[in-house]
Swiss-Prot record:
Gene Ontology MF terms in the entry: carboxylic ester hydrolase activity; lipase activity
Source organism per UniProt: Mycoplasma genitalium (strain ATCC 33530 / DSM 19775 / NCTC 10195 / G37)
UniProt KW Metal-binding keyword: no
GO annotations of cellular component type: membrane
EC annotation from Swiss-Prot or TrEMBL: 3.1.-.-
Gene3D superfamilies registered for this protein in UniProt: alpha/beta hydrolase
Protein name: Putative esterase/lipase 1
Classification via Pfam families: Hydrolase_4
Protein family: Belongs to the lipase/esterase LIP3/BchO family.
InterPro entries tied to this protein: AB_hydrolase_fold (IPR029058), AB_hydrolase_sf (IPR050266), Hydrolase_4 (IPR022742)
Residue positions of the active site: H27, S94
UniProt keyword list: Hydrolase, Serine esterase
Amino acid sequence: MRLEIENGLEFVNDPVVNELGKICFFHPFTGNLTNKLSFRSHFNRYSFYAINYPGHGNSVINNPKQLEFSYWLEITKQFFDKHNLKDVILFGHSIGGGLAVALTNYLSSDQYKAVLLEAPLNPAIVETPLNIVQNLIPDPDSDFAVIQKCLVYNIEKKLGANFKEYCEREKQKSIHQNQRLKVMLEPSTLKQNIVLINAAFLKLNCPALWIHGKQDGIIKYLPSKAYYESLNNKQIQFKAIEAAAHTPYFEQPQKFLSLVNDFFQLIS
């Protein structure tokens, strides 16, 4: 799989012969499309597409408007049109999950087939303490260990004596690499994004699988489940994974892949 750059945006356009389907991946906040290379390896008979949005991977930020959700929706629509993508499974993690849902209100109905969500941004984010959300990009005096525990279940036990050093290293990396993204964590910005995501959830009319870690400290499980139940949409399956926080694919890959395999068989 080859990463390309065009007009400052890094992307993957990787069709396969005799494909079983098409997957477009939408990365999480401060993540990038390489986060799911192992997922793509598992589903290697599917064509794979993805964009690194401005400020992520090797995609550049030319102006602040490129960090707006509406801009991400627009360039994704252009990407789909340029590559003539049809019947795509929209797969998103965290903010990428919110983007995947919002796109169902933005793409034409023949451009997408189903939605796969991993701990997606949804209106339940209001139940997460604001200091947790805003410290996803830390300040020098932030306790980044708290954030790591929200992201990965039992991470302190998993890393043992290396935990403190790991947190400091990740903190410094984020401070140096991600500061320009911090505007995306402002309450007013999140509110605008949630309005778009909620509107799309309310109208969602394609099969969807929503996978959420029960110990998620970023987008909490119980409020997310309550929001899902309020939708009363039989097209959406909601599946919880134990011993997983905000990254269930990496924390419990076999359970995650089993759920996805079943879903892909259902929609094939």
